[in-house]
Amino acid sequence: PGGEVPMLMQALKQYDLTLEKIWITHGHLDHAGGTAAIKELTGVPIEGPHPDDQFWIDQIPESGARYGIPDARSFTPDRWLGDGDVVTLGETQFEVIHCPGHTPGHVIFFHREARFAQVGDVLFKGSIGRTDFPRGNHQQLLDSISLKLWPLGEDVAFVPGHGPMSTFGAERRSNPFVADVVLGAGADGGPDLAGDTVPMRYI
């Protein structure tokens, strides 16, 4: 939860939902800035991200002040997550996959039977996560996508941290940053089509 805590709490009430856990993909303000406040209001456990994102969680108050979000606070997860861990929601299990690059401790959640992934800011429909923030690493991001996401299967549908859903197969065919033809060209010394050209709206 990046913020707008009152709206989120109202939505829970409106739809008669019970919040069981808070899952964090990475420590950036727009994904974790409201975590401490929701934890305070509900008492539910915080799971994730990977410990390598402690740096970003510690930066949340400063980042919040910079962007005019006064109640953005740092927090300590009840459970740090690592590659190969499993998280549960009711009786449903999701696999945790550590996918550094956008941030060093970014994780994604994968439901193997449903062919579904929540990928945070690793991958978007037609784009990829930024790596120009502190401790971002462009090559790590490309490796996370090509070596960790693609092997899960082209039929996997994913929800990104921003923008519409897509599938891994669609992105392998047409994403201008990580399509098979692009990564193949880059490996052969072709043009670098990523880097600073990543759309600024994806943070």
Language-model segments: what does each one mean?
Residues 1-2, 123:
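Anionic group-transfer/hydrolysis microenvironments
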